[in-house]
Amino acid sequence: IIDPEGYPHYERSVTSLRYGSSSRNKEAWNKRFGNDNMWLSKTQSELASIGFHGTGAFCTNTYSKIQTHNQSNPNAPMTLAPSFGFLSQFRSQNGHAYPGNTSDNELGLVLYSDWAEFCKTYIRSAMASYLNDANVLGFFSDNEINFSSQNSRILDRFLQLTDRTDVAYLEAKKFMEEKNATSVTDNLNSEFAGRLAELYYKGVKEAIKEIDPGMMYLGTRLHGTPKYLQHVVAAAGKYCDIISINYYSRWSPELTTYVKQWGEDWADAPFMVTEFYTKGVEDSDLNNQSGA
C-alpha cells in the first residue's frame, strides 16, 4: 500500500486493541501501564519492534485514544481501521424491518430506495472523527455480512419469505423470472448474492468518495461461504479499494485455487486477510481450544 506521503506501507495490524474486562486483566494493566499514555506508547513500541504498525476492526473505546496518541507522537503513530454497522443502523435509523424479521436477511435492506442517501448521512455522523485523518488506513462498513452460508443460500431464504410484498421476496422472484428458472442452483445464488453485493458496496463507495475521497474502503471482511462466491467477490472488487477477508476453516492457504482467484481472476482489487487462526505457544496457560 502507498501511504499518504508516497512511501510503501506493509499493513500488519492487531485486530483488537482494547481493555480486558477481567480482574486479572485490570490488575496486570494497572501494574504494567497505569495510564493510557503509557499503555499506548509501550504498545506501539513493542508492536513496531516485531513489524506491526496498525490496529484493526475491534478496538472498542480505544480508537479516540489511539488518535490522541498519534497526535502526541507524530513520528510513532498507529494506523486505524475502524468497523461500522451500516446495515443495522440503516434499519434502526430509517425504520425498515429485516426481511422475515431476522438479521440473517439484513442484506435485503439495500433494496430500499433510501440506502444510498443513508450511506452519506451515516458517514458524515458516525465517521466524522476519522474523516481526513491520514493515520486512518480505511474503514470496514460491516462485519461478515451473510451473503449466504454453507446450509442457507440467500436466494432460497428470500424466496421463502411469507410476506409477498417484501422487497427482498419481490427481488428474488423477479430474478428467477428473469433467469426463467424454477429452482435455485449454486450458480444462480452466487449471481443473485452478487447483485445485492453490488448495491451494497456501490452505496458505501459512492458516499465515501463524495465525502472523503482519500479514505480507503476496505469492504466487509468476507468470511465462510461469501468469500467463495465469485459474484460477491467481484462486486467487492469493483467498489472496494482493498477486499478484506477473514480466513478460517483452513489451516493452510488455498494458494492454487481460491487465493489465486481472489488475487488474479475474480476481482479488480487487491485483498488482505483481516483475521486468521492463531494459537497460544506451548508454554502458555492457554488451552488452545479457540484461536480467532
What spans do the regions from the language model cover?
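Active-site-adjacent substrate/metal-binding segments within catalytic domains
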Residues: 1-76, 89-138, 187-190, 194-195
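Structural recognition of the beta-strand scaffold that forms the well-ordered cores
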Residues: 2-3, 9-13, 53-57, 79-83, ...
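Short catalytic/ligand-binding loop motif for oxyanion handling, primarily in non-cytosolic enzymes
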Residues: 10, 63-67, 89-92, 145-151, ...
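Residues that line or immediately flank small-molecule/substrate-binding pockets and catalytic motifs
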Residues: 15-16, 59-62, 139, 143-144, ...
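Short, acidic/turn-prone active-site loops that include or flank metal/cofactor-
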Residues: 84-89, 247-250
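Polysaccharide-binding and catalytic clefts of secreted carbohydrate-active enzymes
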Residues: 101-112, 129-231
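Glycoside hydrolase catalytic-domain groove-lining segments
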Residues: 182, 187, 191-287
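C-terminal structured "cap/appendage" subdomains that terminate the fold
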Residues: 290-292
